[in-house]
Amino acid sequence: MQYKCLILDHDDTAVDSTATIHYPSFIAATSKLRPNEKPLTLDEFIGYCFNPGFSKLCTDIMKFTPPEQTYQQKVWHEYTDAVVPTFFPHFISFLEEFKRNNGIITVVTQSESKDIYKAYQNTSIKPDAVFGWKKGQDKRKPNPHPVKRILSDFELRPEDAILIDDLEPGLKMASECNVPTVVAAWSPKPASISSFLKTNHDHYFKTVDQLANFILN
């Protein structure tokens, strides 16, 4: 295989979770925090997560105070505790084949590490490393620190790894480390976002099978 290590996003790359967990939990929180404001549509939410990213959606656009951010995270935790999202079809079988070829599987996510391990616990896959939300702002996505740590910990060159993500903050994080990127285009996105991602990144795949054929062959 050309690549020794996968650096995986989780939400809407490995699992179908924005429409079932992250968006409804955000709307539930904002309905209490901003009851007089029109709720974001799903496309608007995805758009803001794309640019400027979820953290800045909370701080710069919604202008949540620290207590409001704590409340939003509390509601989010209630949803993530209650719902385990499903993996996209063929995703786990792709990882199994990659692992059989001695590949390294890592996850860099804005979800919490415990939710990543929970998602994978009923599969045959145990990630070799997970960098989640609780690592601290200067050590978590979209800061390039997790990618640098993966390269260092596993003694990899940038070209030995490839990052797979559905949104710009993660893809940009990899590009800053000269790590190749794949756009996970199998989760629905507004046309403007899809067009931008297809134009600005190394590889763009509409299905998990296309990704598997590229990585494994």
Where do the language-model regions lie?
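Short, acidic loop-to-helix structural element flanking the phosphoryl-transfer center
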Residues: 79-107, 113, 144
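Asp-based, Mg2+/Mn2+-dependent phosphohydrolase catalytic module
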Residues: 1-4, 113-217
